[in-house]
Amino acid sequence: MKFAFKILYWIQRLPFEMIQSLGALIGWLCYYLIPRRRHIGMVNLQKCFPQWSEKQRTALLKEHFRQMGILLMEYGLYWYSDAARIKKLVRYQDKHHLDDALAAGEKVILLYPHFTAFELAVYALNQDVPLISMYSKQKNKEMDEQVLKGRHRYNNVFLIGRTEGLRAIIKQMKKSDAPFLYLPDQDFGAKDSVFVDFFGTPTTTTPGLSRIAAMTNAKVIPAIPTRHGDGSVMLRFYPVWQNFPSGDVLADTQRMNDFIEARVREHPEQYYWLHKRFKTRPAGESDFYQETAHAAKSDKR
């Protein structure tokens, strides 16, 4: 693992254009070398874009692997590069929505879905804004130590372990003026989740956004990072959500998924398709991904 970190260190010393090209190559290779993830991505796209042809979905998935390869090769930038270099690669759009809320003394939750440029954007944002964020412990000890070191490189973030739960989040938000960075769009199982639609499919979704907003009186401000053709990233902030929370947790969680879906449709190749977003199914419904092992052997694309 330390050897991999050294490789990333030397990669970040390359010109940015070369890092992008190397990442694109790695993504292309991964598309063909990791059939299990390829299958998961294809199942997700079939569920979300059933009206598309197989050719369209395959083209988008290949582009998504390219984006993921770039994300992977950029980790050296996030961990080792000069902070000013990172800042130059990220531009803000409508950041006044966040600035105005913080200036008014509001508690803020940044709704921050998993787009492929999310790491680069947040490493730039954290230079300007202190953040509260969740952290999932890595299985590999060396990786866990490196990720934590990277997260704390500006001494401007407070991390809460995912196992600490809602109470730890509320406690930290109440004693801090920092926004809470909320990444909501993964399947953590049926416990403490609700089923609401995502691209028309019932999907286990954590209703934490509504509950945390209600318990802290926080304003919800979405922030979406998108990558441009030159590799730079635009982090766009959206207006504070009005009438949120509404008192109806299901309606609030559906509103969140609808917003994320709308943003995904704008940049579908940049959304994170390689995890099992639809893994947990309602009672009696079969596993969408159960053919993964067979498909991994037979899919030659």
Q: Model-found features: residue ranges?
A:
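Non-catalytic C-terminal accessory region of glycerolipid acyltransferases
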Residues: 52-62, 100, 127-130, 163-301
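Residues that cap or flank secondary-structure elements
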Residues: 33, 89-90, 113, 139, ...
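Membrane-anchoring hydrophobic helices of lipid-metabolizing enzymes
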Residues: 1-112, 144-148
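A broad structural signal for alpha-helix termini and local helix breaks/kinks
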Residues: 14, 33-34, 49-50, 155, ...
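Short glycine-/small-residue-rich flexible loop motifs, especially phosphate/cofactor-binding loops
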Residues: 42-43, 122, 148, 193, ...
